[in-house]
Regions:
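Boundary at the C-terminal end of the N-terminal hydrophobic targeting segment
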Residues: 2-10
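Structural detector for short beta-strands of small beta-barrel domains
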Residues: 9-40, 80
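Extracytoplasmic
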Residues: 15, 41, 71-75, 104, ...
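OB-fold (S1/OB) nucleic-acid-binding surfaces
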Residues: 32-57
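Short nucleic-acid-contacting surface segments enriched for D/E, G, S/T with interspersed K/R
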Residues: 60-78
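Carbohydrate-interacting regions of secretory-pathway proteins
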Residues: 60-61, 70, 88-95
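Short, charged beta-turn/beta-strand-edge "cap" motif at the junction between a beta-strand
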Residues: 81-87
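Cys/His-clustered metal-coordination modules, chiefly Zn-binding fingers
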Residues: 90-140
């Protein structure tokens, strides 16, 4: 029986680097593959540093890249979970990679002091939240 998401072990995880893009736009740029207009922004994918396109499961962590275009402009390292027989990956953690270093990304509510994984109103107070960028230990 395949492992459920909450049962996945470290052997099912990987670290991938690149930029998150819309799959249809990347297929057009990299390979000249044209999709229908309505597919243009349907699927998010990680375009790796060597131009592989890896689809992203759009749960709350994946959806963050749709809701906040700042994330799609960043070079990122994604800690992902892979499932046997599935080409898409599920995001576990997000890191920004810059010349200054590696930074873990999430969203933060200063009022409630809670972290969230996508740009939206705070789950608790319904107030605004901010993109939080914290230096990350090099635990790779």
């Amino acid at each position: 029986m395949p492992a459920r998401a909450d049962e996945a072990s470290d052997r099912n995880s990987a670290r991938l680097t690149g930029r998150v893009v819309y799959l249809a736009e990347a297929l057009q740029k990299l390979h000249g593959v044209k999709t229908v207009d309505e597919a243009r922004q349907n699927t998010l994918a990680l375009q790796t540093d060597d131009d592989q396109l890896i689809p992203i499961v759009e749960d709350v962590r994946g959806r963050a890249f749709r809701r906040d275009d700042r994330l799609r402009k960043m070079r990122v390292e994604l800690l992902v979970r892979r499932y046997e027989g599935v080409p898409a990956v599920q995001i576990i953690r997000v890191f920004e990679l810059t010349d200054e270093g590696r930074f873990e990304l999430d969203y933060w509510c200063d009022i409630c002091a809670i972290a969230m994984f996508e740009l939206k109103a705070c789950d608790c107070c319904q107030g605004p939240i901010e993109l939080r960028r914290r230096p990350a230990a090099d635990d790779r």
